[in-house]
């Protein structure tokens, strides 16, 4: 059987990414698995020397084909910092943002070439990314640009709750101006395709409303009747099992209890808050609509605890395992 290899990007090296990657790859189930880290080898060794990460072998390779996977060995394709000795933990730095960008770019190239079958990303810092001149709102938009993907969406994934977003990194004030029937219908379609890929035969998809009580028949806004309902009607006509618009304050609980397989959230915090409340340590961020599987730990760089040994690796480990499963 063909080995499915996953590339793991370091994210911002001044954050918890280097720590949680090495911790995750030292766990049972991932120790010795077909995984390749793309990041600054000097930074990984620096954390290991401080006793922050397990004492495993960090083996440098130039190509994925050179890897010989075995327990106790982590293979690293080195993307060096310009000044590794100048890197400071927990601080926004241009060289850290540039490294995070280069790691994602390298992993994307490997995935598009078929050298790896999926990528799992550790968190990057958006301010550092911008400071380095890479003006993307986050991983999702960066990956879409690198892969020339037009129809894509952010999925947050746990065993009991799955959420896909119509919009993500946009000011709430601007969100309503960009909301369209076409975009909502596209995201419903992405949700249906994604759920079928992960094993759902007839996915049940709920569409959350925009306004309180999903507009209450126009009393609190008309986006539901004017924008969402036509998208739902069109999706149903294509054979999709879609419900809504549903009141946002109850639809996530209904999905959590098994009534729906995925919720279409309208904007960033509408989808993120319930999922992070219920699955902060085991939630996974997935970019649906790319030509390959991309997963990520569902948290940020945690600069406040960077390089202290306090970072928990559960979400990173779950994201890597899911990438292996879906690849």
Curated annotation (Swiss-Prot):
Null allele phenotype: Deletion mutant is unable to use D-threonate as a carbon source.
This protein's record includes keyword Magnesium: no
Entry annotated with the keyword Metal-binding: yes
Superkingdom per UniProt: Bacteria
Entry's cofactor comment: Binds 1 divalent metal cation per subunit.
Enzyme Commission number(s) of this protein: 1.1.1.408
Record key words, sorted: Carbohydrate metabolism, Metal-binding, NAD, Oxidoreductase
Binding site for a divalent metal cation: 169, 213, 268
CC cofactor: a divalent metal cation
Molecular function in Gene Ontology: metal ion binding; NAD binding; oxidoreductase activity
Pfam families found in the cross-reference section: PdxA
Catalyzed reaction equations: 4-O-phospho-D-threonate + NAD(+) = dihydroxyacetone phosphate + CO2 + NADH
SUPFAM superfamilies on file: Isocitrate/Isopropylmalate dehydrogenase-like (SSF53659)
Record's subunit section: Homodimer.
Function: Catalyzes the NAD-dependent oxidation and subsequent decarboxylation of D-threonate 4-phosphate to produce dihydroxyacetone phosphate (DHAP). Can also use 4-hydroxy-L-threonine 4-phosphate as substrate.
PANTHER family reported in the protein's UniProt record: 4-HYDROXYTHREONINE-4-PHOSPHATE DEHYDROGENASE (PTHR30004), D-THREONATE 4-PHOSPHATE DEHYDROGENASE (PTHR30004:SF6)
Entry's family note: Belongs to the PdxA family. PdxA2 subfamily.
Name of the protein this chain belongs to: D-threonate 4-phosphate dehydrogenase
Species, as recorded: Salmonella typhimurium (strain LT2 / SGSC1412 / ATCC 700720)
Highest classification ranks of the organism: Bacteria, Pseudomonadati, Pseudomonadota, Gammaproteobacteria, Enterobacterales
């Amino acid at each position: 059987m063909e080995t499915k290899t996953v590339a793991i990007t370091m994210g911002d090296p001044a954050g918890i990414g280097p720590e949680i990657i090495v911790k995750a790859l030292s766990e049972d189930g991932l120790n010795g698995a077909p995984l390749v880290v793309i990041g600054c080898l000097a930074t990984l060794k620096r954390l290991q020397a401080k006793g922050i990460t397990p004492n495993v072998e960090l083996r440098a390779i130039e190509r994925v084909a050179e890897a010989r996977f075995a327990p106790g060995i982590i293979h690293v394709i080195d993307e060096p910092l310009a000044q590794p000795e100048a890197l400071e933990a927990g601080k926004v730095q241009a060289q850290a943002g540039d490294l995070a960008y280069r790691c994602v770019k390298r992993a994307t190239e490997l995935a598009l070439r078929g050298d790896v079958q999926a990528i799992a990303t550790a968190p990057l810092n958006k301010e550092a990314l911008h400071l380095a001149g890479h003006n993307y709102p986050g991983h999702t938009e960066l990956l879409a640009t690198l892969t020339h993907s037009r129809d894509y969406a952010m999925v947050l994934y746990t065993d009991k709750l799955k959420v896909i977003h119509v919009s993500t990194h946009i000011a709430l004030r601007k969100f309503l101006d960009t909301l369209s029937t076409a975009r909502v219908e596209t995201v419903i379609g992405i949700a249906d395709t994604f759920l079928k890929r992960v094993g759902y035969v007839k996915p049940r998809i709920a569409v959350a409303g925009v306004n309180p009580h999903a507009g209450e028949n126009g009393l609190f806004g008309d986006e539901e009747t004017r924008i969402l309902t036509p998208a739902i009607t069109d999706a149903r006509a294509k054979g999709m099992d879609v419900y809504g618009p549903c009141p946002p304050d109850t639809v996530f609980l209904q999905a959590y209890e098994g009534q729906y397989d995925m919720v279409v959230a309208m904007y960033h915090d509408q989808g993120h808050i319930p999922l992070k409340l219920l699955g902060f340590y085991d939630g996974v961020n997935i970019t649906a609509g790319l030509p390959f599987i991309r997963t990520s730990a569902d948290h940020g760089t945690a600069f406040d605890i960077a390089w202290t040994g306090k970072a928990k690796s559960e979400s990173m480990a779950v994201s890597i395992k899911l990438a292996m499963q879906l690849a």
